């Protein structure tokens, strides 16, 4: 069995192994093995050269190295001479031997090949090499042996690392045992499939392994050709067979005598390539160094312990800097007679080479050619080539023959040569014992003695001589110098650390170490030299001077005292007493600027802990702390610097800001008492809390911690303190305390007439109002109780001044100061922060209601806000004759809730003969209905025209700024509004904006040339500032100044009051809030941002707000707009609690918004939830205290959950205590919402508590106050929640405002208590009715918004939240889920843009309360049909449908029909009234409650258990329920046709479908007939509403159940097919004008009249008296009263007597005898004026096929049948305006009265209509019959009927006579004796002819006559 020799080469600490590997099967009995490492390096280091030893190495050494030199010198001289030259020449090879056992054979591996030392006798490599070197035997051509390196030296040089035995490692060559030579068969070459060049950082990949092939290829011999390798002497290679070679990385075919081109694999590189393993049965062949392919090592099969060898795979360095090659070849072992598999090659993918490569030529197969010296082998990827398969006959088996040892005997004595032995003896004898180690020297002695004995002995043979020679030589060679102790001492010295010793002793050590190392490295050093070096180095080590222990300084912490603006750096110091520490310096920098330096020296640096404090640091600035320590350990001063530490003080605390007032509240026994004027300290403070009211934030409640008396800055005060988590307050020096402090002044008693306390001042003046009173300091009116409406109710006649020539102020007036002042003086006193909120009171002013006598107010400035009902003014309401106000100023807001046009003025309301001069006003005036001006709205001189005009009732030299915005202005102007007749307003300037009013003067007095105009002069506006109307002639002439001109003019007025500043009171100074201007880093350019950020981070201190604000871009909206509110959102839902949010909406005062995204932040305070605004990098905190409110929430819940909607609590609250109380609650329709509120109480109450007043700490008194308030108002609170929950779920785009309305009312910028607002809403029944939602908003909710009414509020939100540009589209969008809105504009060109849309109609006063209910439909499905005259409300449920989609088609058809109807009337109506169709208040049309399951009861139930949602959600809350009354529908009309209470109610019938539309035309006729359809003349006297609808103006349809279809009427709505089967015009839209309609009506009536006439002629032609009496009946007069004027129609059969006397010869006889065909209408009395469900006679429809011949001309009002019939005939003959209006309306009533007629009669009317042509209707009818007969006789338009062609009267008459004749055959006598006849044939013919003529003439667009 064969075993392989494995060879590998690796880089060994900078020494590159050779490239090719080789192996050879060896001699038969190799018993031992050794590992050889051949190192090829062009230059061995000088250190290695110095250590080369001459002679032979000790064979007992396990490891040694043999050194060869290229044979470049003549082979002369000794080894010493060679070593001498060694420094100048190149060492060529180094063979490292690792010896494990006895060596069987030696392989010397050179750069290009293999040298084999063949025989067993040559197994000793030392001996062999020695012979080769000493005896000159050239066994290794080109090299000579130089010397060797011992194992220890190899270790020193780092070459020992290749000698590890444990496993196969790169860089090792192993010779292993080979037991028996065997033939090697079936060997294939291993080829590299590929070679990879990859970038340095690219990942390594493995390519697929090549497939194994069992086929054999012939071997190729390779002979060493590299001159750099030692060669085996000829003749000594007998035992070696040529080894088969595989070239790794090249392509070498194994065919004998063939040349193979080798493709070079890679270029050399500085980077090692990946290693690969190559295994081939037999002998692996090493590649050339320049062609070495990188192979990846692969684990080899494990060999027996004694045979294990370590392999190394060469690594090749690529020259391409960015790439490295990697290739893996896996070797395999093969056994005899087995096919050798081709090695597997793992090849990563090849990346593109950056440079081209060249392929060197190969001279002979198996002998690679090295590149020229000036070339490098190029690197290129190798494309694998498949080797050709060797034919079977070429396969061969090769065997290695056994070597033979043959001994030939010769009988001659051999000579003995002892010369060499002698030489060795001489050499050994000359050795000195001091030059070598004792052991080696002692070992030489015995050998020398033995050698000498052999030398002296004669009978020795040459072998013995040789043996002893060799032994001696070996012993000499074994002489050595022992450097072990030296090396150990050097190693010990190197373990020393420089830092531990003094510089001088350390330097001495380094000197001696260097010397010792030279000795150790010197191979020629003697043992004595070594010993001396050891002694000196040991002594130097012992003399090292050790340094003292280094001190250790550690920065352990930085203690930030944020409130004190201080940071303390704390350190620990170790070894502080072992070394001299000179100083420790802590330096604090801000950027590069050194802020502070703390130097610690002496005893301050001897403690274990030290610190450095830095004070007066700025917040939010990054400081750098640098710490340096200087010390001396013995080498002089050393400096150590610690790592820099960043320090930043970030102050983030809760600070109460923008405080309006602070009150000390005592809550005890359910009563809240303001104790802000305490005079003693209470013993029990637990029921006290501070109530801090902000100008724009929530009120904060703080439990009082302590109240104490103290003196601050000389002022005795009560100091009230409170503490809360994170709460701080700012001290006078802008420092902080961790408590809130409020000071209450201890009253100071007055001194003479100088007063220091407002309460005492009021009491004094009230007691004696005639004296002079002076203010000794500024004082607050807060919490002082007035004596009435004003603080001082008695008439003030004294003086009010400031003392000591100063300007003091009375602050925080909450009521007017005086009622009346007479002959009084108020001078040099300011009134600041006036807060008079009395919206329910009249005559509100800061100083007085009335100013009389010679009263004077001068040098006074007022600031603040006043609100009242009627008459609100800044100073006084009314100035009387002789009074004067001069050099005064008002800054603030005035608001009037007036509805009657009272006066609102910045200075006064009215000035009657007084003087106002040098007044300055900068204010905003708002109100409902008021006369308003910023100075004085009314300047009144009176009617006395005397010489004082212009000196009294004067307003002059004044200036105004600000704005006036009054909803319903009554003479509004910036300066003044009313002066008639001769008040004087002059020389004044306005910078103000007037929203709805005049820019300067507010009324047409300015154009009154007789009186007022001349005294209104020199009024100036300012370009770019002032605005408003200039509606009057003179107004347009007023000058507009530039800003510069205006300022200059104002300067000439010498007004100083606007600049008056009062001294703060001592108390005000103590409680003064620091302005932002005093805060660090304040920037005036960001002032708006700071104010706005109070809304984004409401809790945080001003310093933090400034810090955050300064991060913004100056142009950002947060710095350029005013923020009203900031609200958290989660997607599109408003978050009003502490639930998670992901964005905020910022609402600005200009009605715009921004959204900003949020991310969570962990940097908030314990009681403040914080987010980061990711868009801006600043913070946001919800305005909710983060605390546990569970107890309070549960307490409130327990109070509310016990209250039911139907309960005694609720009855008492709403004052519904009678029998109707249950239904009164039901009438609110709030059950569903109330249930929803009760089911969500916990959530709702939590939000309520969180959004109510802030409770920063735990105040039991405050909690109890809230509980008691809820208990007291529990019913109101629940109703408030229920109401808002029910009606304010309004959608704007993607958002719904319900959460805002419930818990975030301050969204709109008004500060409000959520709890108080809810209680207010639920406090009155009128506030929570569904039918008053619009009104309730204005009365209760408007004041909390920026809108005056619901319409404005909804519009504001639309603009804010959506991109929808109008309210109508928004309303459709907001209701689309539950309301379908069909809007129809007119198709008449001139009115197509008229108001018709739903929301426009709904917002009118009579319908505006429907808006919120419609916006909050939840389950029902409603529809609206809106046009310019009416709006209809219906539901899908009423139609039996379940969704809006189910009803859209039918609703749309109805909407079209409604519109067509009104358009028809607009085309028809008289010009003077048609515009009335465009109603401002459209007619509401309400659906009934006849649900599919039956009539619904009032509260939405039917079929006992079903809920009718349209009633529950809309009709019921709107109070539109009505009981079933048996009607189909009805209209509610009033005497005034424009009465907004007018409406239409469907009862049994539906509003849609054709009949529903027809009913629509019926009911709206009732609404519109008087004012529009009848020309504005109203109903004709003696008739009423029902006479005009059905049977006259209602559009007839089929299927109604009534007899109107086929009766007289007009189709105003529907388009029908012109198919010859129609009764009415087929398309009413084709009648474009009134003339078109009249033409239609003419043809319509002509045709009917002609057919009546022909029927009569045909019957009469039968000359049958019985037939006549059966065919006709009578329309008789039935007088309504005794005056026999007004009549009814009495239709009856002829009496027997009349039958007997009946004589009919012509149509005229029928007329005269008032006869009609005996068909419908039926017999009875028909009353046109009846309005009774029991009398249906006015509803009569006159069938078109019924011939009515009589006229029944009345002397008053006609009967119903005659009225309708005559109206149509007159319309047809005389047209709409003359005929129809003349007859059907009261058009001639007034004229008839003038003409002396008591009643309006037919007789009078026909004369008027016919212009006296006819005196009776009968005359008219006879003429009409004659006219149509005459026209027909001349010819008819040709038509065909019943198969007959008709073109003349005679043709038609013939057909009728035949029909009558047939009918006459049915004449019979009934049992009662009356004759009856069927008229069926005649009626059918008549109908057929009519319909044919209608078709033939296209609805009578052409005449029926020729």
Swiss-Prot record:
EC number in record: 3.4.24.-
Residues where Zn(2+) binds: 1562, 1566, 1586
Residues of the signal peptide: 1-33
Bias type Polar residues, positions: 181-196, 421-436
PTM: The Gram-positive cell-wall anchor motif LPXTG is located in the N-terminal part, in contrast to such motifs in other known streptococcal and staphylococcal proteins. The protease could be cleaved by the sortase and anchored in the membrane via the two potential N-terminal transmembrane domains, whereas the propeptide located prior to the LPXTG motif would remain attached to the cell wall peptidoglycan by an amide bond.
Proregion residues excised on maturation: 34-76
Transmembrane segments: 77-98, 105-127
Main localisation: secreted
Positions of the UniProt region annotated as 2 X 15 AA repeats of K-V-E-Q-A-G-E-P-V-A-P-R-E-D-E: 277-375
Keyword Lyase: no
Region listing for 2 X 23 AA approximate repeats, in residue ranges: 293-375
GO cellular component terms given for this protein: cell surface; extracellular region; membrane
Keyword Electron transport: no
Region (Disordered): 178-436
One record GO biological process: proteolysis
Compositionally biased spans, kind Basic and acidic residues: 201-239, 252-262, 271-335, 352-375, 383-408
Cofactor note: Binds 1 zinc ion per subunit.
Enzyme class name: hydrolase
Cofactor: Zn(2+)
GO MF annotation list: metalloendopeptidase activity; zinc ion binding
Intervals, Extracellular compartment: 128-1906
Function of the protein: Is a virulence factor capable of inducing inflammation in the lower respiratory tract, by increasing tumor necrosis factor alpha (TNF-alpha) concentration in the lungs. Also appears to have other functions important in virulence in models of pneumonia and septicemia.
PANTHER family according to UniProt: ZINC METALLOPROTEASE ZMPB, ZINC METALLOPROTEASE ZMPB-RELATED
Entries under NCBIfam families matching the protein: LPXTG_anchor
Name of the protein described by the UniProt record: Zinc metalloprotease ZmpB
């Amino acid at each position: 069995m064969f075993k392989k020799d494995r060879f590998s080469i690796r880089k060994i600490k900078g020494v590159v192994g050779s490239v090719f590997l080789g192996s050879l099967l060896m001699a038969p009995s190799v018993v031992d093995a050794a590992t050889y490492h051949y190192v090829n390096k062009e230059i061995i280091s000088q250190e290695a050269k110095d250590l080369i030893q001459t002679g032979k190495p000790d064979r007992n050494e396990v490891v040694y190295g043999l050194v060869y030199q290229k044979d470049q010198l003549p082979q002369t001289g000794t080894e010493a001479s060679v070593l001498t030259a060694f420094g100048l020449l190149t060492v060529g090879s180094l063979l490292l031997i690792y010896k494990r056992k006895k060596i069987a054979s030696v392989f010397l591996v050179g750069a290009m090949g293999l040298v084999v030392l063949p025989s067993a006798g040559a197994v000793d490599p030392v001996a062999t090499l020695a012979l080769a070197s000493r005896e000159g035997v050239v066994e290794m051509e080109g090299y000579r042996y130089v010397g060797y390196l011992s194992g220890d030296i190899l270790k020193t040089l780092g070459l020992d690392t290749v000698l590890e035995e444990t496993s196969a490692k790169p860089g090792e060559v192993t010779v292993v045992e080979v037991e028996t030579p065997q033939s090697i068969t079936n060997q294939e070459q291993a080829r590299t499939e590929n070679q990879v060049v990859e970038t340095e950082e690219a990942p390594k990949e493995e390519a697929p392994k090549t497939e194994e092939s069992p086929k054999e290829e012939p071997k190729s011999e390779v002979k060493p050709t590299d001159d750099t390798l030692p060669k085996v002497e000829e003749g000594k290679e007998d035992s070696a067979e040529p080894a088969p070679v595989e070239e790794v990385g090249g392509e070498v075919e194994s065919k004998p005598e063939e040349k193979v081109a080798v493709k070079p694999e890679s270029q050399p590189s500085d980077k090692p390539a990946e290693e690969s393993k190559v295994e081939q049965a037999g002998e692996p062949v090493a590649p050339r160094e320049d062609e070495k392919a990188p192979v990846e090592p692969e684990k080899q099969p494990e060999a027996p312990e004694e045979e294990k060898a370590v392999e190394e795979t060469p690594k090749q360095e690529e020259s391409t800097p960015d790439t490295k090659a990697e290739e893996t070849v896996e070797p395999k072992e093969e056994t005899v007679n087995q096919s050798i598999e081709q090695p597997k090659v793992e090849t990563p993918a090849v990346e593109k080479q950056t440079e081209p490569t060249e392929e060197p030529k190969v001279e002979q197969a198996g002998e690679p050619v090295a590149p020229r010296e000036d070339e490098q082998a190029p690197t290129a990827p190798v494309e694998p080539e498949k080797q050709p398969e060797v034919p079977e006959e070429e396969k061969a088996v090769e065997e290695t023959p056994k070597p033979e040892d043959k001994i030939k005997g010769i009988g001659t004595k051999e000579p003995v040569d002892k010369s060499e032995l002698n030489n060795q003896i001489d050499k050994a004898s000359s050795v000195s014992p001091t030059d070598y180690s004792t052991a080696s020297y002692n070992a030489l002695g015995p050998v020398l003695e033995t050698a000498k004995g052999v030398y002296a002995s004669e009978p020795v043979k040459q072998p013995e001589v040789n043996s002893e020679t060799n032994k001696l030589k070996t012993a000499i060679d074994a002489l050595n110098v022992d450097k072990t102790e030296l090396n150990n001492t050097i190693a010990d010295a190197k373990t020393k650390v420089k830092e531990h010793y003094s510089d001088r002793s350390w330097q001495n050590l380094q000197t001696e170490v260097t010397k010792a190392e030279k000795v150790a490295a010197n191979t020629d050093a003697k043992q004595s030299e070594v010993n001396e070096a050891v002694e000196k180095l040991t002594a130097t080590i012992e003399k090292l001077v050790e340094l003292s222990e280094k001190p250790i300084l550690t920065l352990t912490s930085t203690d930030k005292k944020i409130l004190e603006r201080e940071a303390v750096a704390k350190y620990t110091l170790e070894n502080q007493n072992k070394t001299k520490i000179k100083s420790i310096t802590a330096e604090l920098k801000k950027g590069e600027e050194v802020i502070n330096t703390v130097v610690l020296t002496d005893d301050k640096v001897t403690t274990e802990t030290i610190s450095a404090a830095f004070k007066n640091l700025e917040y939010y600035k990054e400081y750098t702390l640098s710490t340096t320590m200087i010390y001396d350990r013995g080498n002089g001063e050393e400096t150590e610097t610690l790592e820099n530490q960043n320090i930043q003080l970030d102050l983030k605390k809760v600070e109460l800001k923008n405080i309006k007032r602070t009150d000390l509240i005592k809550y005890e026994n359910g009563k809240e008492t303001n104790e802000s004027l305490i005079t003693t300290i209470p013993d029990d403070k637990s029921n006290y809390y501070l109530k801090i009211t902000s100008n724009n934030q929530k009120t904060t409640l703080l439990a009082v911690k302590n109240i104490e008396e103290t003196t601050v800055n000389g002022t005795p005060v009560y100091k009230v303190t409170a503490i809360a988590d994170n709460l701080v307050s700012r001290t006078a020096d802008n420092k902080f305390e961790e408590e809130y402090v409020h000071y209450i002044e201890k009253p100071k008693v007055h001194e003479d007439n100088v007063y220091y306390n407002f309460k005492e001042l009021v009491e004094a003046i009230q007691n004696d109002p005639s004296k002079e009173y002076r203010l000794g300091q500024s004082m607050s009116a807060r919490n002082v109780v007035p004596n009435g409406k004003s603080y001082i109710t008695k008439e003030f006649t004294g003086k009010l001044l400031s003392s000591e020539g100063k300007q003091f102020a009375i602050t925080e007036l909450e009521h007017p100061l005086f009622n009346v002042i007479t002959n009084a003086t108020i001078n040099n006193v300011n009134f600041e922060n006036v807060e008079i909120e009395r919206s329910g009171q009249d005559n509100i002013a800061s100083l007085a209601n009335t100013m009389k006598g010679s009263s004077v107010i001068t040098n006074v400035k007022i600031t603040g806000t006043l609100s009242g009902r009627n008459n609100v003014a800044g100073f006084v309401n009314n100035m009387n004759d002789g009074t004067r106000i001069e050099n005064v100023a008002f800054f603030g807001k005035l608001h009037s809730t007036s509805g009657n046009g009272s006066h609102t003025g910045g200075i006064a309301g009215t000035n009657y003969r007084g003087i106002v001069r040098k007044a300055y006003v900068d204010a905003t005036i708002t109100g409902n209905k008021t006369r308003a001006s910023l100075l004085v709205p009314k300047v009144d001189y009176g009617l006395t025209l005397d010489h004082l005009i212009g000196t009294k009732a004067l307003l002059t030299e004044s200036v105004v700024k600000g704005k006036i915005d009054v909803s319903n202005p009554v003479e509004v102007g910036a300066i003044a509004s009313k002066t008639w007749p001769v008040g004087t307003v002059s020389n004044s300037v306005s910078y103000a904006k007037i929203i709805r009013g005049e820019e300067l003067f507010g009324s047409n007095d300015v154009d009154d040339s007789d009186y007022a105009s001349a005294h209104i002069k020199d009024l100036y506006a300012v370009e770019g500032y002032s605005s408003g109307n200039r509606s009057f002639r003179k107004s347009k002439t007023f000058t507009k100044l530039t800003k510069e001109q205006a300022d200059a003019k104002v300067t000439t007025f010498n007004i100083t009051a606007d600049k008056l500043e009062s001294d703060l009171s001592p108390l005000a100074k103590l409680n003064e809030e620091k302005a932002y201007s005093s805060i660090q880093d304040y920037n005036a350019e960001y002032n708006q941002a700071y104010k706005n950020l109070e809304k984004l981070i409401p809790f945080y201190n001003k310093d933090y707000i400034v810090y955050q604000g300064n991060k913004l871009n100056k142009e950002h909206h947060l710095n350029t707009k005013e923020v009203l509110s900031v609200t958290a959102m989660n997607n599109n839902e408003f978050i009003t609690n502490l639930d998670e949010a992901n964005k905020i909406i910022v609402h600005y005062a200009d009605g715009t918004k921004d959204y900003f995204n949020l991310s969570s932040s962990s940097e908030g305070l314990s009681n403040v939830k914080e987010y980061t605004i990711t868009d801006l990098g600043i913070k946001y905190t919800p305005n909710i205290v983060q605390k546990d409110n569970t107890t309070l929430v549960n307490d409130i819940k327990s109070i509310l959950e016990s209250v039911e909607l139907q309960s005694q609590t609720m009855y008492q609250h709403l004052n519904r205590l009678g029998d109707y109380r249950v239904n009164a609650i039901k009438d609110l329709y709030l059950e569903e919402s109330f249930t929803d509120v009760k089911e969500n109480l916990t959530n709702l109450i939590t939000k309520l508590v969180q959004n109510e007043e802030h409770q920063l700490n735990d105040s039991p008194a405050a909690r109890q106050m809230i509980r008691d308030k809820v208990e007291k108002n529990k019913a109101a609170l629940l109703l408030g929640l229920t109401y808002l929950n029910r009606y304010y779920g309004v959608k704007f785009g993607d958002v719904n405002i319900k959460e805002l309305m419930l818990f975030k009312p301050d969204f709109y910028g008004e500060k409000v208590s959520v709890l108080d607002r809810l209680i207010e809403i639920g406090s009155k029944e009128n506030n929570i009715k569904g039918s008053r939602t619009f009104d309730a908003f204005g009365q209760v909710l408007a004041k909390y918004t920026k809108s005056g009414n619901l319409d404005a509020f909804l519009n504001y939100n639309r603009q804010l939240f959506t991109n929808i540009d109008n309210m109508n589209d928004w309303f459709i969008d907001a209701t689309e889920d539950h309301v379908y809105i069909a809007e129809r504009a007119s198709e008449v060109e001139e009115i197509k843009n008229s108001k018709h849309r739903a929301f426009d109609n709904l917002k009118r006063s009579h319908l505006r309360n429907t808006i919120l209910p419609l916006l909050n439909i939840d389950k029902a499905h409603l529809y609206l049909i809106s046009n310019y005259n009416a709006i209809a409300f219906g539901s899908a449920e009423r139609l039996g449908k379940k969704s809006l989609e189910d009803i859209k088609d039918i609703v749309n058809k109805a909407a079209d029909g409604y519109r067509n109807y009104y358009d028809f009337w607009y085309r028809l109506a008289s010009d003077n009234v048609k515009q009335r169709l465009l109603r401002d208040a459209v007619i509401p049309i309400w659906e009934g409650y006849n649900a599919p399951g039956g009539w619904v009861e009032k509260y939405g139930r039917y079929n006992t258990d079903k809920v009718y949602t349209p009633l529950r959600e809309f009709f019921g809350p709107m109070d539109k329920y009505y009981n079933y009354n048996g009607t189909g529908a009805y209209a509610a009309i009033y005497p005034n046709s424009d009465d907004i209470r007018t409406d239409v109610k469907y009862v049994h019938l539906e509003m849609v479908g054709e009949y529903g539309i027809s009913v629509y035309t019926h009911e709206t006729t009732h609404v519109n007939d008087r004012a529009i359809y009848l020309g504005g003349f109203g109903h004709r006297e003696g008739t009423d509403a029902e006479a005009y609808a059905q049977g006259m103006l209602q559009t007839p349809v089929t299927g109604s159940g009534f007899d109107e279809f086929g009766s007289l009427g007009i189709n105003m709505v529907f388009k029908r097919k012109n198919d010859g089967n129609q009764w009415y015009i087929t398309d009413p839209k084709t009648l474009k004008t009134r003339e078109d309609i009249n033409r239609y009506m003419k043809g319509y009536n002509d045709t009917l009249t002609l057919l009546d006439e022909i029927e009569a002629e045909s019957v009469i032609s039968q000359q049958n008296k019985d037939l006549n009496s059966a065919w006709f009946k009578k329309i008789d007069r039935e007088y309504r009263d005794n005056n026999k004027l007004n009549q009814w129609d009495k239709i009856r059969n002829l009496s027997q007597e009349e039958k007997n006397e009946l004589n009919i010869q012509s149509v005229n006889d029928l007329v005269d005898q008032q006869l009609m065909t005996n068909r419908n209408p039926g017999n009875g009395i028909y009353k046109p004026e009846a309005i009774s469900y029991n009398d249906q006679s006015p509803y009569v429809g006159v069938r078109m096929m019924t011939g009515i011949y009589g006229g029944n001309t009345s002397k008053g009002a006609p009967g119903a049948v005659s009225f309708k019939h005559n109206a149509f005939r007159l319309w047809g003959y005389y047209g709409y305006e003359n005929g129809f209006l003349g007859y059907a309306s009261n058009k001639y009533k007034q004229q008839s009265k003038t003409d002396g007629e008591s009643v309006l009669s037919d007789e009078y009317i026909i004369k008027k209509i016919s212009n006296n042509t006819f005196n009776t209707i009968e005359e008219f009818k006879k003429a009409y019959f004659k006219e149509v007969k005459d026209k027909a006789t001349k010819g008819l338009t040709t038509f065909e009927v019943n198969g007959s062609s008709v073109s003349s009267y005679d043709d038609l008459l013939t057909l009728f006579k035949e029909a009558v004749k047939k009918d006459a055959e049915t004449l019979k006598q009934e049992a009662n004796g009356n004759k009856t006849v069927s008229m069926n044939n005649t009626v059918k013919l008549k109908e057929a002819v009519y319909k044919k003529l209608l078709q033939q003439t296209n609805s009578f667009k052409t005449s029926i006559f020729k």
